[in-house]
């Protein structure tokens, strides 16, 4: 029998891994990657997620159980049950370019893993510091940055899980998840939107824009 040295075996594994990492295949189960961005004044909010379809399945309370669930893998056990990943595949994430408020509760600028605990009358939204996990298999409460409670709302049928922004104002908007016949809205507010504009105007007044007198007048009128 021909023998292979450990170095040769390791080299073969590395070559195989590199070759596999370069493959781009269609998403399984129609879990299409999606992203939606909304500006609230100067503040950028982005939700990145995978979008599964209903495909004739019963979603709420069955495919997506109510409450916390032991997934039987990773850190998800009976002792440490998991919330829902709020999408499919890897973590759903939400990013804020500046500090904002979610349902009146403050959260700093940054990117967060978004998880949800579904309920028949109330849902809990979890913003986690872990943004690179696969779904909720590695979820631990110690990584929670913020939790807020919201009410689900019945809506028209949506085949694909979708996030969108509605009720948009200059410094606030409602983000919501929609799937099957249910939506989960949560309000995002910029508490200091005018202050951000004033700070931005001060910075612009040190640039070449200051040489146009119309810009100085516009800045003075706003302030």
Annotate the PLM regions:
Residues 20-107, 113-223:
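Targeting-peptide/extracellular-domain and disordered-appendage signature
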């Amino acid at each position: 029998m021909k023998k292979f040295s450990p170095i040769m075996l390791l080299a073969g594994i590395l070559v195989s891994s590199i070759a596999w990492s370069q493959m781009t295949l269609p998403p399984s189960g129609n879990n299409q990657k999606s992203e939606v961005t909304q500006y609230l004044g100067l503040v950028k909010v982005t939700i990145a997620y995978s979008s599964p379809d209903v495909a004739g399945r019963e979603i709420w309370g069955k495919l997506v159980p109510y409450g916390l669930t032991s997934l039987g893998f990773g850190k998800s056990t009976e002792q440490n049950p998991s919330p829902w990943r709020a999408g499919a595949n890897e973590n759903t994430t939400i990013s804020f370019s500046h500090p904002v408020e979610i349902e009146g509760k403050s959260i700093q600028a940054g990117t967060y893993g978004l998880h949800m605990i579904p309920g028949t009358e109330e849902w809990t939204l979890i913003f986690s510091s872990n943004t690179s996990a696969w779904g909720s298999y590695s979820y631990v409460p110690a990584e929670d940055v913020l939790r807020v409670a919201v009410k689900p709302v019945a809506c028209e049928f949506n085949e694909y899980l979708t996030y969108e922004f509605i009720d948009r104002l200059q410094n606030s908007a409602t983000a919501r998840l929609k799937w099957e016949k249910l939506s989960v809205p949560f309000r995002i507010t910029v508490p200091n939107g005018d202050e951000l504009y004033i700070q931005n105007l001060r910075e612009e007044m040190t640039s070449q824009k200051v040489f146009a007198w119309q810009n100085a007048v516009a800045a003075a009128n706003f302030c």
